[in-house]
Amino acid sequence: MTYAVMDSPLGPLTLVATDAGELAGLYMAEHRHRPPMETFGDRDDSVLPAVAEQLTEYFDHGRTAFDVPLHFAGTPFQQQVWTALQDIPYGETTTYGDLARELGLVPGASRAVGLANGKNPISIIVPCHRVVGSTGSLTGYGGGLERKQALLDHERGDALF
């Protein structure tokens, strides 16, 4: 594994690559669930150029979807949730309960969906920021609620970046 660090309007982003060149992690500074940096291998800011380019386009309002190879390291349930997150359209939100229903889970599974959502290792590209509480309120986000709000505002065209 190797990693790169790129600047963004949200601060530095750490991009983690597998040896096969897949994106395995995208973490913001002070990310709540970021593994220790030493687990990412050596720093090489030339890895994952397509990811960095697409993120720059996203922040410049030129991209609404990503097309980069992803590597999910998690339980089968977490991977199911993370895959479903990619179907939430740009600029829209859904609730944990609605996401649980879309996955065909039993009533009350929204908490499990929320826990899996919170462990998403590939922020922004796997848009866990688009999931909100049942009342529309902002709830947990690994990069912090301020960044979650900034991403939602950005996608609605209300942001400064």
What name fits each language-model region?
Residues 85, 110-119:
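Major-groove recognition helix of helix-turn-helix-like DNA-binding domains
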Residues 124-130:
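Short Lys/Arg-enriched helix C-cap and helix-to-coil transition segments
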Residues 66-70, 113, 138-141:
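Short clusters of hydrophobic/aromatic residues that line enzyme substrate/ligand-binding pockets
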